[in-house]
């Protein structure tokens, strides 16, 4: 009987516990967003994922619609025109 308890203890120590409710997170927009049925309060929906759920991006994410890398240098000189 002690051998059975020892075997069960070793078996439980080796196996990873199964957590119910833990699902694989589907990423979108180049791993910048998460596919969800509804976005959280601080997220904005953008396009749709393959499973017809919204691709939720953080509200501070900038999206380039031109397809090329944009200059993101937001220095003071680039924001305001020069005065003579």
Curated annotation (Swiss-Prot):
GO terms for biological process: defense response to Gram-negative bacterium; defense response to Gram-positive bacterium. Belongs to the beta-defensin family. The lineage of its organism: Eukaryota, Metazoa, Chordata, Craniata, Vertebrata. Residues 1-21 form the signal peptide. Has antibacterial activity. Abundant expression in the male reproductive tract only. Abundant expressed in testis and the caput region of epididymis, but low in the corpus region. It comes from the Eukaryota. One of its GO terms (cellular component) is extracellular region. Disulfide bonds join 28-55, 35-49, 39-56. Transmembrane segments: none annotated. InterPro entries: Defensin_big_dom. It is found in: Secreted. Keywords: Antibiotic, Antimicrobial, Defensin, Disulfide bond, Secreted, Signal. This is Beta-defensin 119.
């Amino acid at each position: 009987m002690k051998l059975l308890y020892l075997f069960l203890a070793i078996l439980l120590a080796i196996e990873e516990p199964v957590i119910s409710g833990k699902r694989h997170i589907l990423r979108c927009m180049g791993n910048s967003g998460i596919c969800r049925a509804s976005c959280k309060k601080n997220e904005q929906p953008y396009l749709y994922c393959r499973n017809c759920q919204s691709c939720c991006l953080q509200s501070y994410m900038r999206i380039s619609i031109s397809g090329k890398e944009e200059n993101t240098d937001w220095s003071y000189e680039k924001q305001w025109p020069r005065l003579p």
